[in-house]
Curated annotation (Swiss-Prot):
It comes from the Bacteria. Allows the formation of correctly charged Gln-tRNA(Gln) through the transamidation of misacylated Glu-tRNA(Gln) in organisms which lack glutaminyl-tRNA synthetase. The reaction takes place in the presence of glutamine and ATP through an activated gamma-phospho-Glu-tRNA(Gln). PANTHER family: GLUTAMYL-TRNA(GLN) AMIDOTRANSFERASE SUBUNIT A, TRANSAMIDASE. Belongs to the amidase family. GatA subfamily. It catalyses: L-glutamyl-tRNA(Gln) + L-glutamine + ATP + H2O = L-glutaminyl-tRNA(Gln) + L-glutamate + ADP + phosphate + H(+). This is Glutamyl-tRNA(Gln) amidotransferase subunit A. Keywords: ATP-binding, Ligase, Nucleotide-binding, Protein biosynthesis. GO terms for molecular function: ATP binding; glutaminyl-tRNA synthase (glutamine-hydrolyzing) activity. The active site is at K76 (charge relay system), S151 (charge relay system), S175 (acyl-ester intermediate).
Length: 485
């Protein structure tokens, strides 16, 4: 059953070829057998999953099934789950059990999905390799000596290893798209405000966005249909009708205008990846698309601007973790200052501390104008670059990452090298645009992803563009060795 896509599993359940309980038991057994070598899960929830599966079977028997009824999924451990630990990959929240469900979790529960557990991630979603997790690194199923990407590395690895047909992720600067590329799956970051952030532990509030991760664009469309929509509890969530994403998958691509930014194909990009991206674009030409070169002149400023804005917001958001109300608390503090200092010092890892330090510095008196204000001005310039580009083209394509998955430790000693792993994805977050990554081939036995970027609220178009490519190719069907059995 693990060979089937989410859409195929839903069809099988509807035809009563198997029950949700059988499907859930099969995936739980697979997690128990394979995940010790991958470490993609922080917490598994077999009792909850089987109870949800039994309830789903009852709904299926009554003919009350929805598109996700009885389908196993897993949640990134950044989403609050009532009665289940929500750690955010940090020692700070190692013992935190949320009293409520995040909006995304509520919506999957209401749709009848089955939650298998909570997935590993970089601490507080800060990282590009899943090496910053308090619970240890996640291994890439294609080569366990390499990283799965981050911060949604557990989600990407679990889907790639067929431990779960679909998983949630979050994307602040590439944290859905980059791990999707490294693990050879499909991942979508929606437009900022398309999916509620209520109950999603905040990293950078003006950048964070939740999205689906699965094997195919069709599966992502099914998941996004559940996730998207207005939520009055999130002031940044947009009150806008949600289209039928799956219905849009049948549209042809004749006359689709594709833009290739020249800035995406310069120094630093692995030539093998560039070749695979151009080969994928050639496939789109055969499908009727028109391709032209475009320019995003301020792209080179996206990484430095991001690493002012995101740490500044992180510094503010993580101030709430003080050892008083919840989270890690040091033993025997001598006074309040000691409680704060030791609790935060013990609870946060090195990368989180680095970003808090950067952000606090950027917001401090005398430096605010020089750093934070300037970064926000650059952010506007980047948004304007995209606006002008989308007057000429319908979608933008390019590499998701400059390299394939790298080995553990290869970049951990050099933060700048690590940050540059997201050089092609960060600008999309700064502008609040939707973007996705789809697999387009392999280099040195490791998957390569292509990024597709669209205008605001064009997720239906992106999903269709990705789906048509996946109808014409089979890269998304490839499975890591030792995982297919």
């Amino acid at each position: 059953m693990h060979r089937k896509t989410l859409a195929e599993l839903a069809a099988g359940l509807e035809r009563r070829e198997f029950s949700s309980v059988e499907l859930t038991q099969a995936h739980l057994a697979r997690i128990e057998r394979l995940d010790p070598a991958l470490n993609s899960f922080i917490t598994t929830t077999p009792e909850i999953a089987l109870a949800q599966a039994r309830a789903a079977d009852e709904r299926l028997a009554k003919g009350e099934a929805g598109p996700l009824t009885g389908i196993p999924i897993a949640q990134k451990d950044i989403f609050c789950t009532k009665g289940v630990r929500t750690s955010c990959g940090s020692r700070m929240l190692d013992s935190f059990v949320s009293p409520y469900d995040a909006c995304v979790v509520e919506r999957f529960n209401a749709a009848g999905a089955v939650m298998l557990g909570k997935l590993n991630m970089d601490e507080f979603a800060m990282g590009s390799s899943n090496e910053t997790s308090y619970y240890g690194p996640v291994k890439n199923p294609w080569n366990t000596a390499t990283v799965p990407g981050g911060s949604s590395g557990g989600s990407a690895a679990a889907v790639a290893a067929r431990l779960v047909p679909g998983a949630t992720g979050t994307d602040t600067g590439g944290s859905i798209r980059q791990p999707a590329a490294f693990c050879g799956i499909t991942g979508l970051k929606p437009t900022y405000g398309r999916v509620s952030r209520w109950g999603m532990i905040a990293f950078a509030s003006s950048l964070d966005q939740a999205g689906p991760m699965a094997r195919t664009a069709e599966d992502c469309a099914i998941m996004l249909q559940i996730m998207a929509g207005f939520d009055e509890r999130d002031s940044t969530c947009v009150d806008r009708p949600v289209p039928d994403y799956r219905a849009a998958l049948g549209n042809d691509l004749d006359g689709l205008r594709i833009g290739l930014p020249k800035e995406f194909f310069g120094e630093g990009l692995d030539p093998a990846i560039a070749g695979l991206i151009h080969a994928a674009v050639d496939e789109y030409r055969r499908l009727g698309a028109i391709v032209r070169e475009i320019s995003l002149p301020n792209m080179h400023l996206s990484v430095p601007a991001y690493y002012v804005v995101a740490p500044a917001e992180c510094s503010s958001n993580l101030a709430r973790f003080d050892g008083v109300r919840f989270g890690h608390r040091c033993e025997n503090p001598t006074d309040l200052a000691d409680l704060y200092t030791r609790s935060r010092g013990e609870g946060f890892g090195a990368e989180v501390k680095r970003r808090i330090l950067i952000g606090t510095y950027a917001l401090s008196a005398g430096y605010y104008d020089a750093y934070y204000l300037k970064a926000q001005k650059i952010r506007r310039l980047i948004s304007e670059d995209f606006r002008r580009a989308f007057e000429e083209v319908d979608v933008i394509m390019g590499p998701t990452a400059p390299s394939v998955a790298f080995e553990f430790g290869a970049k951990s000693a050099d933060p700048i090298a690590m940050y540059l792993s997201d050089i092609y994805t960060i600008a999309v977050n700064l502008a609040g645009l939707p973007g996705m990554s789809i697999p387009v081939g392999f280099s040195n036995g490791l998957p390569v992803g292509m990024q597709i970027i669209g205008g605001y609220f064009s997720e239906d178009r992106l999903l269709n563009v990705a789906h048509r490519y996946q109808q014409a190719t089979d890269w998304h069907t490839r499975t890591p060795a030792g995982i297919a059995d």
